[in-house]
């Protein structure tokens, strides 16, 4: 894991899982995509901060659990520098805690799911339509199973009739 790095920014010291747990998620995603070097910025923020970011970048004036910003290489930046950096992930722990309680999920399991979800966004996955969502969700389910975490969409599928 020496070639994988998470730059953690948690200025307000919000409670989060161990960095080892998050690195395990990054390792799984990197292995699945044959990535040997990867770097990610992980910003841990309050509900107010993520709401501001969500409004500014997604025109949604409400808190969300995660927002990912895929890295776009500036012109002239050498490939050996740019290729390792995947992008920035912003997570609001209070939103994750509420979701985990509402969905009767273990908090660390939910953290791992949402972090993997964000990492996949950095690699270009999306869920703008049903087909994209199915591909992304299936990959998340597969990766989470490797961590011993049950399919997080089962309850939602039953509620949505999917």
UniProtKB/Swiss-Prot annotation:
Q: Which InterPro entries match?
A: MetalPrtase_cat_dom_sf_prd (IPR023091), YbeY (IPR002036), YbeY_CS (IPR020549)
**Domain of life, per lineage:** Bacteria
Q: Where in the cell is it found?
A: Cytoplasm
Q: Name one GO biological process term.
A: rRNA processing
Which cofactors are reported in the record for this sequence?
Zn(2+)
Q: Is-annotated flag, keyword Nuclease?
A: yes
Query: Where does the chain bind Zn(2+)?
Result: 117, 121, 127
Its Gene Ontology cellular component terms are: cytoplasm
Please state which protein family the record places this protein in. Belongs to the endoribonuclease YbeY family.
The role this protein plays is: Single strand-specific metallo-endoribonuclease involved in late-stage 70S ribosome quality control and in maturation of the 3' terminus of the 16S rRNA.
Spell out the protein name for this chain: Endoribonuclease YbeY
Species of origin: Francisella tularensis subsp. novicida (strain U112)
């Amino acid at each position: 894991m020496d070639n994988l790095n998470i730059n953690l920014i948690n200025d307000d010291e919000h409670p989060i899982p161990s960095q080892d747990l998050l690195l395990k998620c990054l390792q799984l995603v990197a292995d699945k995509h044959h990535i040997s070097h990867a770097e990610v910025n992980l910003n841990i923020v309050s509900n107010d901060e993520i709401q501001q970011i969500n409004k500014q970048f997604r025109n949604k004036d409400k808190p969300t659990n995660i927002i990912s910003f895929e890295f776009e290489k500036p012109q002239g930046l050498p490939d050996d520098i740019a290729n390792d950096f995947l992008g920035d992930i912003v997570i609001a722990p209070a939103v994750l805690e509420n979701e985990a309680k509402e969905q009767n999920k273990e908090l660390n399991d939910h953290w791992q799911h949402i972090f993997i979800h964000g990492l996949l966004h950095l690699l270009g996955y999306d869920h703008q339509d049903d087909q994209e969502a199915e591909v992304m969700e299936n990959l998340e389910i597969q990766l989470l199973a490797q961590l011993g975490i049950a399919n997080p969409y089962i309850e939602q599928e039953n509620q949505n009739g999917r």
